Curated annotation (Swiss-Prot):
Positions annotated to bind acetyl-CoA: 380, 386-387, 405, 423, 440
Disulfide bridges in this chain: none
Residue numbers spanned by region Pyrophosphorylase: 1-230
GO molecular function terms attached to this record: glucosamine-1-phosphate N-acetyltransferase activity; magnesium ion binding; UDP-N-acetylglucosamine diphosphorylase activity
Cofactor: Mg(2+)
Renumbered residue ranges of the record's region Linker: 231-251
Gene: glmU
Compartment annotation: Cytoplasm
Cofactor remark from the record: Binds 1 Mg(2+) ion per subunit.
Family recorded in the similarity comment: In the N-terminal section; belongs to the N-acetylglucosamine-1-phosphate uridyltransferase family.
Protein name: Bifunctional protein GlmU
Coiled coil (residue ranges): none
Length: 460
């Protein structure tokens, strides 16, 4: 087990978000900002992680339940005060402790590991994670001496003209010698404009004691982004989306327009897949090799196998096997299974149903709570009537059956293998194997009756 520890600051309300949801629970690329930070922290293999909770603590704890210890900051009295809340869990332990805000979703595990290596190799008591900003306005500046040693952190409002020209900024992430951190926290106070305990004050305490403080500069400024409002949230989303899409492209996926493609962080895509513009892939979706998703397709928590073609359709919580074609304008709802080489065409809705291998439903159909066998033809306009206002009922269709167009199947009904359901029928009873089911009125022609209606030329 390592002697690395982590404190994630997640107690704040995030007033500028203008939301009832705690700030760290807003999502970027499908998971909360807090989860992004926790994943980065996990890369350093901490022996303990303590998450500081406060505003709506129960919601925050639910996200990391079983993954972190928690400490409650009942009053938000500053970053230093927040870290103090972790003392019962961490005080006295040998090693180094990361302190990181839960609203920094772009930080990477690689950067945190580099921070630890830098800290240990330089034998620092504290190391600040910094970044070079083209426009440092609003950030605390890192002030170094002529030898490049960190002297202090100066906030924007306190900086003189020279200090304001410094482009190295404090990201708000730190690595400390664990014992010295909690010793120094006992010496900070609220003698400042905000009346709060500032974590940055421990840096001054270390310097005054002649202890070594360093700074590790991030390679990518984007990683330093702290999200305080919806504008920054959108910025984080855009940066993360670019990272995700580029990762898939490097792995052999073709994107027609990556700037207009939205893929959550946990989505998996096989090589040689083609993703057209305005495709949205969410949750735990898996896309197989060589599968094509055309413009406008949306998939959530579904598994789509290799060599499928999904055209401008919605698929949710379902499984699509190899060689299936769906759409355009189809809706595959939760709990559905489309087996190998199934075809589901335009304006077809499938809900909690299984379609067997080679089955085709080409147009204007609703199949709900149905099990359809192999090589079945489902004609245009077929409707399974599966709901009586309270209960759902099942339709079963055997292999090689033929369901004629404009058929209504009032469940529960079983249609046998090789059966034929006559077009235009309303089916209320089972149809045996090899039988024809007909449920419609017999046609009757009345000669000359059309002349009585206003449309007829004789009436004009």
């Amino acid at each position: 087990m390592s002697n690395n520890y982590a404190i994630i600051l997640a107690a704040g309300k995030g007033t500028r978000m203008k939301s009832d949801l705690p700030k760290v629970l807003h999502k970027v690329a499908g998971i909360t900002m807090l989860e992004h930070v926790k994943r980065a922290v996990d890369a350093m293999e901490p022996a303990k992680t303590v998450t500081i909770v406060g505003h709506k603590a129960e919601l925050v704890q639910a996200v990391l339940e079983g993954q972190s210890e928690f400490a409650l900051q009942s009053e938000q009295l500053g970053t230093g005060h927040a870290v103090m809340m972790a003392e019962p869990a961490l005080a006295g332990l040998e090693g180094q402790t990361l302190v990181i805000a839960g609203d920094t979703p772009l930080i990477t595990g690689e950067s945190l590991k580099n921070l630890i290596n830098f800290h240990v190799s330089h034998k620092n008591v504290a190391t600040i994670l910094t970044a070079q900003a083209d426009n440092p306005f609003g950030y605390g500046r890192i002030i170094r001496n002529a030898d490049g040693e960190v002297q202090k952190i100066v906030e924007q409002k306190d900086a003189n003209d020279f200090e304001k020209q410094v482009k190295e900024i404090n990201t708000g992430t730190y690595l400390f010698d664990n014992k010295r951190l909690f010793e120094a926290l006992k010496d900070i106070n609220t003698d400042n404009a905000q009346g709060e305990y500032y974590l940055t004050d421990v840096i001054s305490i270390f310097r005054q004691a002649g202890e070594k403080v360093g700074a590790y500069v991030l390679r990518d400024f984007d990683e330093s982004l702290g999200v305080n409002d919806r504008v920054a949230l959108a910025t984080a989303e855009a940066v993360m989306r670019k990272r995700i899409n580029e990762k898939h492209m490097v792995n052999g996926v073709t994107f027609i327009n990556p700037d207009a493609t939205y893929i959550d962080i946990d989505v998996e895509i096989g090589a040689e897949a083609v993703i057209e513009a305005n495709v949205v892939l969410k949750g735990q979706t898996v896309i197989g090799e060589r599968t094509v998703l055309t413009n406008g397709t949306r998939v959530r928590d579904a598994k789509i196998a290799a060599d499928a073609v999904i055209s401008n359709s919605d698929i949710e919580e379902s499984v699509i096997e190899e060689g299936v074609t769906v759409g355009p304008y189809a809706h595959i709802r939760p709990g559905s299974l489309l087996k190998k080489d199934v075809h589901v065409g335009n304006f077809v809705e499938i809900k909690a149903s299984t379609l067997g291998q080679g089955t085709k439903s080409g147009h204007l159909t609703y199949l709900g709570n149905a099990t359809i066998g192999n090589n079945v033809n489902v004609g245009a306009g077929t409707i399974t009537v599966n709901y009586d206002g309270k209960n759902k009922f099942k339709t079963t269709v055997g292999d090689n059956a033929f369901v004629g167009s404009n058929s209504t199947i009032i469940a529960p009904v079983t249609i046998g293998d090789n059966a034929l359901l006559a077009a235009g029928s309303v089916i209320t009873k089972d149809i045996p194997e090899d039988a024809i089911g007909i449920g419609r009125g017999r046609q009757e022609n009345k000669e000359g009756y059309a002349t009585r209606f206003p449309f007829h030329p004789s009436q004009k």
